[in-house]
Amino acid sequence: MDVNQPKQEHLLALKVMRLTKPTLFTNIPVTCEEKDLPGDLFSTLMKDDPSTVKGAEILMLGEMLTLPQNFGNIFLGETFSSYISVHNDSNQVVKDVQVKADLQTSSQRLNLSASSAVVADLKPDSCIDDVIHHEVKEIGTHILVCAVSYTIQSGEKMYFRKFFKFQVLKPLDVKTKFYNAETDEVFLEAQIQNITTSPMFMEKVSLEPSIMYNVSELNTVITNGDWKGSSTFGTKTYLQPLDTRQYLYCLKPKPEFAEKAGVIKGVTVIGKLDIVWKTNLGERGRLQTSQLQRMAPGYGDVRLSIETIPDTVRLEEPFDITCKITNCSSERTMDLVLEMCNTNAIHWSGVSGRQLGKLHPSSSLHLTLTLLSSVQGLQSVSGLRLTDTFLKRTYEYDDIAQVCVVSSKLQAES
């Protein structure tokens, strides 16, 4: 939309054109039956038309390229490029010509002029050309303000402006979900939907983690001999309009932070997504989300997690598990007592009610326990109780892990 000031006779003319990639020319084929009145007239005209594909004239898509006929859509993350030309339409020399281009957004005003130098003399039929570029980082209304100032031969200073308004639209709809694992791992599921009217080539979708985490992408399938793996989306990574794609990432605490239970517990900032795509004829767009935040998991004052446990055990034969007990409090030292309560299927081996000693804030201890199962099948490990003798508070831990119990005879045969 071009909103100009009241018309005034100026010696200079300002032209602004948005620079975009050309598109393939399309035409509407008109055909008829051979017995109809036109006969082969339409087919002959289409064969002579240079915009049609030879041998496939009835296809709407041609081989010729066409320049944009209108301003078109601009999406967040794309680069806005424009060609600005100031031409001297008069028959006299104009002095001290200066061209300035600003971009006004809802929050700021940016100077896009490549050079602010003043042109001393602009002869008749001469012009000043400039190309501006700007990576669009805000949605909503944008106004390109082009201002021209110059001095005519009489010494009078002249000035005029032109305004070009355009809307920046949102290209992608990004939704995220977090899943907190017992091992301090965080799984991020990112759903990305193409809300434009044209397909996109998804060049890169990566997660830049915060300083406390390492990230691994779970969007590839490892095949025989291919250590790099292949994409779960196949070789053609096009995202059609209104299609949605899901990406999965696993974040693990770095070793220097993994033992600091209180620090990891309170971390809410996970990182940010970096998305790069291409549209028609390779036009690139890039979008970075703001810092993604999760709800901090509530482990309570004491956290018990399983470090090692066998997948399969024999019926009525002892096996060992390793537990990690963490004091999640940042201020209080705990004096813990461990009690082991048998269930219908799980029986603990050892002394119940033993002292574990003092556990300082944000510190952990590892504990190896022995148990056996009297029932076959998939059994849940339950029955652990931790009592803080200072506060006389008991913490119950049930269904902390699962183990497959098979008979000794079955395992021997396998």
From Swiss-Prot:
A single GO cellular-component term on record: TRAPPIII protein complex
Matching Pfam families: TRAPPC13_C, TRAPPC13_M, TRAPPC13_N
Xref: InterPro entries: TRAPPC13, TRAPPC13_C, TRAPPC13_M, TRAPPC13_N
PANTHER family: TRAFFICKING PROTEIN PARTICLE COMPLEX SUBUNIT 13 (PTHR13134:SF3)
Complex formation: Part of the multisubunit TRAPP (transport protein particle) complex.
Sequence similarity: Belongs to the TRAPPC13 family.
Full protein name: Trafficking protein particle complex subunit 13
The encoding gene: trappc13
